[in-house]
A protein has these predicted regions:
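A structural signal for short hydrophobic beta-strand segments in well-ordered beta-sheet cores
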Residues: 27, 122-125, 191-194
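Beta-strand->loop->alpha-helix junctions that form or flank phosphate-binding loops
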Residues: 14-18, 92, 106-129, 148-154, ...
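Short, flexible loop/turn motifs enriched in small residues
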Residues: 48-49, 127-131
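Generic structural signal for helix capping and beta-alpha/helix-loop junctions
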Residues: 22-23, 97-98, 119, 184, ...
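Nucleotide phosphate-binding/pyrophosphate-handling subdomain across enzymes
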Residues: 53, 130-131, 135, 139-256
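Short internal beta-strands
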Residues: 87-92, 229-232, 255-261
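Phosphate-binding loop of NTP-binding sites
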Residues: 1-92, 96-108, 161, 168-170, ...
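Well-ordered beta-strand scaffold positions
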Residues: 32-34, 40, 125, 140-142, ...
Length: 261
């Protein structure tokens, strides 16, 4: 979203989690009245925000050391959606997010997702080569045009669809949306290519939750590498201990030692 608005010439303010090359960091102060903020639900921090527009990508069993149950997370997201004044753009393909949106009124509710029953959805997804993915962006059955991404993974196709929906809601043209997404090369520690040694490519990714790990590994294994090795460092012991036991599909795994706790 930040990349799209910046490319479209909006002098926005931004406060995001990863370092974004186009703004030379994770934040900037602009002259317009538009600000993008990557909100976090941990300890209900995002309930201190009162956004005009909220984008809900998904809801998963995360931060269980604070919330205790997924139901409590869903309730927190419901409260966040209620705090939003104009529009909530949410993942209509995610059951937990849909549950959080039940009973939300007084604002426009717009869905994005994997299938045609959502307002915005991708069609004809093609993984061209390496990090490049093409798809057609659809809006309520109508094709808006082609999107070209230079970031890996099916999850980023949905992220791009959500960003496009939000940008067009605030008046950005499809042409500027497509241009901004084509110029997006990822953020720091989000499948970030660090370099190459011989035939080995080193990628750094912040993923430490099972769903994030699965998405990242699927993206890596869809690329033309002969073998994928995952070196995993739990984020913190307390948080990792609260996560459910899951099986991750990865060819090779080396467990990294956590030094934070």
């Amino acid at each position: 979203m930040t990349q799209i608005l910046f490319t479209a010439g909006v002098d926005l303010s931004a406060f995001i989690g990863g370092k974004l090359p186009c703004i030379h960091g994770s934040g900037r102060s602009g002259s317009s009245d538009i600000m993008t903020c990557e909100a976090c639900e941990f300890v209900d921090t995002f309930l201190k925000l009162y956004p005009d527009i909220a984008v809900l990508l998904n809801i998963d069993a995360d931060h269980l050391d604070y919330f205790g149950t997924v139901e409590n997370i869903i309730k927190s997201f419901h409260r966040f959606a209620q705090l939003t004044s104009k529009a909530v753009i949410y993942n209509g393909s995610d059951a937990n997010t849909c549950k959080a949106m039940e009973g939300i009124t007084g604002k426009e509710c717009i869905t994005f997702g994997k299938t045609a029953d959502c307002d915005y959805y991708p069609a004809n997804i093609r993984h061209v080569s390496g990090l490049e993915t093409h798809f057609q962006l659809m809006h309520r059955g109508k094709e808006l045009g082609e999107i070209v991404l230079h970031v890996a993974g099916e999850h980023n196709v949905l992220n791009a669809t959500a960003a496009a929906a939000a940008a067009m809601y605030v008046g950005v043209s499809f042409a500027d949306v497509a241009k901004g997404l084509a110029e997006f090369r990822g953020a720091g520690r989000r499948f970030e290519k660090k370099g190459e040694v011989g035939s080995i490519t080193l990628v750094d990714d912040y993923a430490h939750h099972p769903t994030e790990l699965t998405a990242t590994l699927k993206a890596a294994m869809a690329m033309p590498f002969r073998k994928v090795w995952a070196v995993f460092q739990p984020f913190t012991f307390s948080r990792t201990a609260m996560l459910p036991r899951v099986e991750l599909q990865m060819p090779q795994t080396v467990l990294g030692r956590n030094t934070e706790e």
